[in-house]
Amino acid sequence: MRKDSKPWFFVALVTVAIGISYFDRQALPVAISAIQRNIPISDAQFALLQAAFLATYALLYAGGGKFLDTIGTKVGFAVSMAWWSVACALHGFAHGMVLLVMARLLLGMGEGAAFPAATRVIAEWLPATQRATAMGIINAGTALGSVLAPPLIGLILLLGSWRYIFFFAASLGLTWAAGWLVVYRQPAEVASRQTEGGVAPIPWLRLLASRRVLGMVSAKFLSDSAWFFCLFWLPKYLYDARGFDIKQVSYFAWIPYAASGLGSFSGGWFSSRLLRRGRSLNFSRKLPLGLSAALMPAVILVPHVSVSLALLLFSIAFFGQQSWSGLIMTLPTDVFPLSSVGSVAGLIGFGGAMGGAIFNLAAGQLLTHGAGYGTLFAVVGSLHAVAFAILLFTSGVLRPPGTNIFQERGKLVSS
């Protein structure tokens, strides 16, 4: 394999891994109508299942970053994938809520290391001018899994039990983990880069003392509250509010997820293009972030329009959200030393997943007690604007590649 193509080969492999992770987490929401024929699940219980996944996902997102910084990307990513694949298979053995909740908890634990691992692969192999594009491609894996989930799950349901969905997904993940162990290698210079001129891994307490880190975590908390609600509840909204059956969900639910994939790539491509044209790192990251956030309010109109227009509005919002997501997860690779990239990415992801868990629980309770989807979509549509304002207020000027914010004036910069 040519040396210049190897980084992009690894980016492709990571994209597939993220696709598998999203297929696994989407299997339950897409198949919920079939599962409910065997296991009664209310709106509040559905919210609990998603919150259970997100709670452990949050904890292991933070811990997974530290885990990867300690044992490395190759082994850490493979262990993570194998863990969540086994957890996915456990869903297929469930006959009640107890095992389903346990399976969701274990699934979140495994998937928590996925994006920190992706961030480390990018930091190990690619320069700053290519990282946003690479993260955009990897983030498009979220769409890959989400787009394939409705039609594939619909096909499996036509052929047999909903339980086979989870066994099929688990087999994909275990195959990927074995392949990753065989093919992945760190670049020869990574060992010397990991300390970047003597900078040791930064302790979590010092990271959390930085206003920049707290700003990124807070922004992700808000934006992922919106994203995880849309991700998990879109199929259920189509079932409950629009009267869809599994065949209609299989035909149409993939469309907004496909738009999210285009957003993942487009945001990173646009940011990298601005950098190549000589614009500052600060401008090249923040302009696309702001434009992405401006698309999310489209979901506010969803309950008030026809189903065709609702799918279009979902698509616009999903495009903006995943453009945003890829860009915000690129920021740790820009301004933190490689030795701490996994930890910072983990803390940011922790904030996002905790936001998703809390918002999912709140959504389930609101729907159970008479609130409509209109109220929820109004809140969801406003969160990215607040998140972007927080990011602008806390991030300061993003430094050019090679400038470490923790080395300015010999002390930690927290403003």
For each of these PLM feature ranges, what is it?
Residues L28-P29, R211-F265, Q321, S325, ...:
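Extracytoplasmic gate region of multi-pass secondary transporters
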Residues P40, G72, F93-L99, P127, ...:
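Helix-breaking motifs and short loop linkers at transmembrane-helix boundaries and internal kinks
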Residues T333-G370:
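A late C-terminal transmembrane helix in Major Facilitator Superfamily
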